């Protein structure tokens, strides 16, 4: 009865299956946690969604920014970009079923017994766990409702970037979405910076990675997250697990077995094209 946490899959279906075979994942007894961004960039987004959906209660996942963008494309709000390689999924006969399932997935996973929290980008230090839970439920309720296209149309944007319980309406939902799915850096007071994507050693002052700023959740729980592939799984404090290691860019797909904290990796089937900065089929 093992718990396996895997970083951003990004449509890398073959690597996902190979990694699960490597760890001898047994859906009947084991549980798979996925950090979000199941889709886009890799060649197998359709197969990834079909497989993950088939796991039923054996999987616990959170939505990432690429998953939300896919839903916006599906709703006719955003453009389908060729580099995301989503057309086979969008044109599949079961696309409606898969994407209506996807939009009903959570933004936050919490296991009180393990003292483990998972969100795609992390947990802003401005929130305690109760606030994070309430905020996740706010967005999840809209995404699972018939009015979800209205929300998806309004979710794009970088403001507001400072949490306040007084935030309401679409501004509140946009902040929550950015905090759960796009966050990397914060100012010392926890205010989000939505612009810098530099590696931590090159980040402009006074910005710090969100996990370098003490917060109520990180003080009491372990946090698993994805989203930030350039970290390469390194440089986080004890109890903070960065699991996106850039499989879709030619890196690796990383798995953490929770019970003994052992890591497993599956090399990408793609190799980095340094001229374009994009991974290509190997």
Swiss-Prot record:
<comment type="function">
    <text>Hydrolyzes diadenosine 5',5'''-P1,P4-tetraphosphate to yield ADP.</text>
</comment>
<dbReference type="InterPro" id="IPR004843">
    <property type="entry name" value="Calcineurin-like_PHP_ApaH"/>
</dbReference>
<dbReference type="Pfam" id="PF00149">
    <property type="entry name" value="Metallophos"/>
</dbReference>
<dbReference type="InterPro" id="IPR029052">
    <property type="entry name" value="Metallo-depent_PP-like"/>
</dbReference>
<comment type="similarity">
    <text>Belongs to the Ap4A hydrolase family.</text>
</comment>
<dbReference type="GO" id="GO:0008803">
    <property type="term" value="F:bis(5'-nucleosyl)-tetraphosphatase (symmetrical) activity"/>
</dbReference>
<dbReference type="InterPro" id="IPR004617">
    <property type="entry name" value="ApaH"/>
</dbReference>
<keyword id="KW-0378">Hydrolase</keyword>
<protein>
    <recommendedName>
        <fullName>Bis(5'-nucleosyl)-tetraphosphatase, symmetrical</fullName>
        <ecNumber>3.6.1.41</ecNumber>
    </recommendedName>
</protein>
